[in-house]
Amino acid sequence: MNNFFNNINKEFIMASRSGLEVLMPVMYLFIIMVFFNISISYVDKNIITELLPLMVWMSCLLICVLNLETIFREDYDDGTLDMFIINDRHMERDIIAKIMSHWILSNLPIAIIAPILTIILGLDTDTSFVLFITLLIGTPTMSLIGSIAAALTISLKKNKILVSIIVLPMYIPILIFGTSAVNNSYFNISYNSELIMMIIIFLIFLLVSPIACSKALKISLD
């Protein structure tokens, strides 16, 4: 367990060297939400409020896709991935640490800030809290799914489009359940089944992703 947290701490130190790049996802979200609000300012306020959760979810999904390439890229460039394969016994543990640190640095800030933005833009606090819960479950799931695509395409120089093609269809269930839960909360309908389905998907990929990534990295680096 100590080695796991040591690996996460190492990832944080490496990410801190990138400076403002860590803040880019939050800046993207802020810009998207501002432009969204300006572009439909002529629409009825109630309609805008109903659309806010969907817009947040779509923004988070696209930002997650943009960040996927960075999960293994630096380790691939400096040769650390070769050490992962040599130290095969702990490869899955190292991969999980890398995915978790990527999520904490890239997607967790979005999950925290997005509901605050929706409250500022007029969404009620209860619905914003449900939005936060769905993002807290959905964004790590997207990182787990995306890590598989990133591992499969790591040896390709321009892999962003290919990664997007692979992961976007797999993100659809998360998007459906996430937006449905928030929408149900807005209209005071039970959203428990949607949250349960999101948790099940998360647990499935929490088990599958480390194994799939290790196999994909071995194939890509062969």
Spans of model-derived segments:
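A structural motif at transmembrane helix-loop-helix junctions in multipass membrane proteins
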Residues: 137-168, 218-222
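Transmembrane alpha-helical segments of integral membrane proteins
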Residues: 145-148, 173-185
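Hydrophobic alpha-helical transmembrane segments that constitute the membrane-spanning cores
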Residues: 31, 96-121, 141, 145, ...
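Membrane-interfacial helix-loop-helix connectors in multipass membrane proteins
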Residues: 39-51, 115-136, 182-195
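Aromatic- and glycine-rich beta-strand/loop motifs that create alpha-glucan
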Residues: 1-25
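Junction motif at the cytosolic side of a transmembrane helix
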Residues: 206-222
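Hydrophobic alpha-helical transmembrane segments of multi-pass membrane transport proteins
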Residues: 52-86, 91-113
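Hydrophobic alpha-helical transmembrane segments of multi-pass membrane transport/permease proteins
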Residues: 19-40, 55-64, 165-177, 201-209
